[in-house]
């Protein structure tokens, strides 16, 4: 079984990837999306969103990273895919699942679910641009507002030549509502395809991971929000290990707090720590207490002083 760390825009930035891969055995990470419009992007854009490209596309602990592209113009997706591959990406992933209103408003992400033919052409262009030895993957949801087109969407991906497909078990309109997860539909789609299907959605622990594998019939899982709730989730899902003790979570947060300038992700660092604590408190009651302690911090120095105090 492979366990893949999902792309989460504005959340799983390069340094969080580094932290999580150093305490897990992820088989692959997918980067935050590189937005492609109507031009070949400069190399600095790829390096900013995926600095692992400086290290042969690997995190510090050796986990391969695959660049994800977002856009709706097959030609420009293909040209930017070639650039990402030249820089060292371990294949290319196409984003057809992001539910963000901003992204969808510019005809990217999940908006492509309404246009299976465009998904086909984009996938085909990527497959032609990427060397055959390297994978082209596509991440989708079950549909826009219902799952009636799920088969058509998946067929478009397969007919376009993708190596594998990741299916999030909800529609775009379902958002992240737990009661809307539909693993059974992933299984229906999987049985129709000959390419590998990676299941995604509502995987929080060993039990839900096993349930997802059983109901979808998939052999591989992609985890996103759960990886932030329990920082060693791949170990939990793969090996039924216990969740990481809070003391070890604190060490990760301490590392994060002291690397404010290591990567330029374009996001406000203090807010990112607070955001991560929002995820952590679902599994660790201590995270809420720490959030209350730092919630008035507005700069990195104040944040570090607070966290250093807790560590000591």
Swiss-Prot record:
PANTHER family: TRNA-DIHYDROURIDINE SYNTHASE, TRNA-DIHYDROURIDINE(16) SYNTHASE. Belongs to the Dus family. DusC subfamily. Its EC number is 1.3.1.-. FMN binds at residues 7-9, 68, 139, 200-202, 224-225. It catalyses: 5,6-dihydrouridine(16) in tRNA + NADP(+) = uridine(16) in tRNA + NADPH + H(+); 5,6-dihydrouridine(16) in tRNA + NAD(+) = uridine(16) in tRNA + NADH + H(+). It holds the Pfam family Dus. The record marks 35, 95, 176, 272, 274, 279, 295 as: Interacts with tRNA. Its cofactor is FMN. This is tRNA-dihydrouridine(16) synthase. Transmembrane segments: none annotated. It comes from Pasteurella multocida (strain Pm70). The active site is at residue 98. InterPro entries: Aldolase_TIM, DUS-like_FMN-bd, DUS_fam, DusC, DusC_C, tRNA_hU_synthase_CS. Keywords: Flavoprotein, FMN, NADP, Oxidoreductase, RNA-binding, tRNA processing, tRNA-binding. One of its GO terms (molecular function) is FMN binding.
């Amino acid at each position: 079984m492979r366990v893949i760390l999902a792309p989460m825009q504005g959340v799983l930035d390069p340094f969080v990837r580094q932290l999580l891969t150093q305490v897990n055995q992820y088989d692959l990470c997918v980067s935050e999306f590189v937005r492609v419009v109507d031009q070949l992007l400069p190399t600095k854009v790829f390096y900013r969103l995926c600095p692992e490209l400086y290290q042969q596309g690997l995190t510090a602990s050796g986990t391969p990273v695959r660049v994800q592209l977002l856009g709706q113009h097959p030609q420009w997706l293909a040209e930017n895919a070639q650039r990402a591959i030249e820089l060292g990406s371990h294949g290319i992933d196409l984003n057809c699942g992001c539910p963000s209103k901003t992204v969808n408003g510019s005809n990217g992400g999940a908006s492509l679910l309404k246009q299976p033919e465009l998904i086909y052409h984009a996938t085909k262009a990527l497959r032609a641009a990427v060397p055959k030895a390297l994978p082209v993957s596509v991440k989708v949801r079950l549909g826009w507002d219902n799952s009636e087109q799920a088969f058509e969407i998946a067929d478009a991906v397969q007919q376009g030549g993708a190596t594998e497909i990741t299916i999030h078990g909800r529609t775009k309109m379902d958002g992240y509502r737990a009661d809307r997860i539909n693993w059974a539909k992933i299984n229906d789609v999987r049985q129709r395809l000959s390419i590998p299907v990676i299941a995604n959605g509502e995987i929080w622990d060993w039990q839900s991971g096993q349930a997802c594998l059983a109901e979808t019939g998939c052999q591989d899982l992609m985890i996103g929000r759960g990886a932030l709730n329990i920082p060693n989730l791949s170990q939990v899902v793969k090996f039924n290990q216990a969740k990481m003790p809070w003391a070890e979570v604190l060490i990760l947060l301490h590392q994060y707090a002291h690397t404010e300038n290591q990567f330029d992700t374009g996001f406000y660092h203090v807010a990112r720590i607070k955001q991560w604590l929002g995820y952590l408190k679902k599994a660790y009651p201590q995270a809420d207490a720490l959030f209350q302690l730092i919630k008035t911090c507005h700069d990195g120095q104040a944040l570090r002083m607070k966290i250093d105090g807790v560590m000591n």
